[in-house]
């Protein structure tokens, strides 16, 4: 007899179908349910399901098994390009007969300053060499953030940047270079392929807890009293009626 009514791996999906989670926008729920394989960073995939064993010439099945990666909290405040900590063990004195010791492999980190054309701001960010190479390949920070999917960014800071960029592109914010409209139009035209509706951009990069709080605040907005709605409608009707009726002009007698 099973211990649970539903398998454990289904609990998170079932949670999204109940309560306030079920009232979240459809595009946000789809982004949570999408499971994409991140780009391999710490291992090289075989690229095939079978290979020939050089010893006996037989075909053998091979499988790509990703190395477990631990992303510390500081990785969410920088751009590590998918790199993280690898937890493992090594032999003491490089001797297989001696005991094994715990070992943590960490990426080399650098602090660099980047400029965002869309946000018109400079950021000092902790990055890795892989991140610098990816930014160079994408021809700038903005293209790197907008092109890289969530599972490859692996950074809350990166997703917050993406949300800010998408919101500015969706709103065509005039606060960007207000003294130079031509430059502003050129920037918006340069990144127009990434523009999405503002209603979707507001939810990009939010965690489930942040999305639930946002939905709760939207639902708890103070309702407008009915008498204010009726008064506004009455005033509008009276204004339209006054404009539609012809004006009556009384002629005065010449002797008066």
UniProtKB/Swiss-Prot annotation:
Domain of life: Eukaryota
Subcellular location per the Swiss-Prot or TrEMBL entry: Mitochondrion
Quaternary structure and interacting proteins, as annotated: Component of the mitochondrial large ribosomal subunit (mt-LSU). Mature mammalian 55S mitochondrial ribosomes consist of a small (28S) and a large (39S) subunit. The 28S small subunit contains a 12S ribosomal RNA (12S mt-rRNA) and 30 different proteins. The 39S large subunit contains a 16S rRNA (16S mt-rRNA), a copy of mitochondrial valine transfer RNA (mt-tRNA(Val)), which plays an integral structural role, and 52 different proteins. Interacts with OXA1L.
Keywords, ordered alphabetically: Mitochondrion, Ribonucleoprotein, Ribosomal protein, Transit peptide
UniProt record, GO biological process: mitochondrial translation; translation
Gene3D superfamilies: Ribosomal protein L28/L24 (2.30.170.40)
Organism name: Homo sapiens (Human)
Chain segment of the transit peptide: 1-55
Residues spanning the membrane: none
Tissues in which the protein is found: Found in a variety of normal tissues including spleen, testes, thymus, liver, kidney, brain, adrenal, lung and retinal tissue.
Annotated GO MF terms: RNA binding; structural constituent of ribosome
Protein name: Large ribosomal subunit protein bL28m
GO CC annotation: cytosol; mitochondrial inner membrane; mitochondrial large ribosomal subunit; mitochondrial ribosome; mitochondrion
Comment field (misc): Potentially represents an important therapeutic reagent for HLA-A24 patients. This antigen is recognized by tumor-infiltrating lymphocyte (TIL) 1290 in the context of HLA-A24.
Family: Belongs to the bacterial ribosomal protein bL28 family.
Signal sequence, start to end: none
InterPro entries in UniProt: Ribosomal_bL28, Ribosomal_bL28/bL31-like_sf, Ribosomal_bL28_sf
Pfam families, A to Z: Ribosomal_L28
